[in-house]
Structures are given as structure tokens and as C-alpha cells.
């Protein structure tokens, strides 16, 4: 089990997805953030749910995902809906840029 798999709210499926995109430690996940982790997962062909965003954010705050404040959920949802640069995320997200 990786360090990410021992974080609160993150089970084996979340751990496998995050590990597959190069996220193995709490500092790596903290640097990437919940929204960019979700984006990186989708760019790499995974189909995470919005609940994973809540779970990651809550894990980083060390609280149960159901205790995530509504204003935090609203902020995260707004960030997800905002324009973003996929190329920059691929370059910064795991150090490997995909062709195409």
C-alpha cells in the first residue's frame, strides 16, 4: 500500500488510480491538489467521480469527506468548471508529456 492509500477517505481503487498517474505520497497529492488530480486522472483515461474530488480534498484536510464544508465543495466545483491548460498539467503533473 502506498502512502496515498493510507490517507483518510482514499480506498484501494482511488490509490490505484492515483498511483497510475504518478501520485504515491501525501506531498505529491498536496502539490497537485484535488482538482488537478481529478483532471490528470481524466486526461490519463480514468473516469473519476466528483466524490473523488471531495475525498481527496477532505483527505488533505484530514477530515471525513462527508464533513467537507459546502463552501469548499462549491469552490472545488467552480475550479473544475473553469478553463484550464491540459498541456501544462501534463508537463507539470507527472513530468511526462504524452504525444498527440
Please report, for each region that a protein language model flagged, where it lies by residue.
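An amphipathic, hydrophobic-aromatic interaction surface with interspersed Lys/Arg
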Residues: 26
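Sterile Alpha Motif
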Residues: 1-8
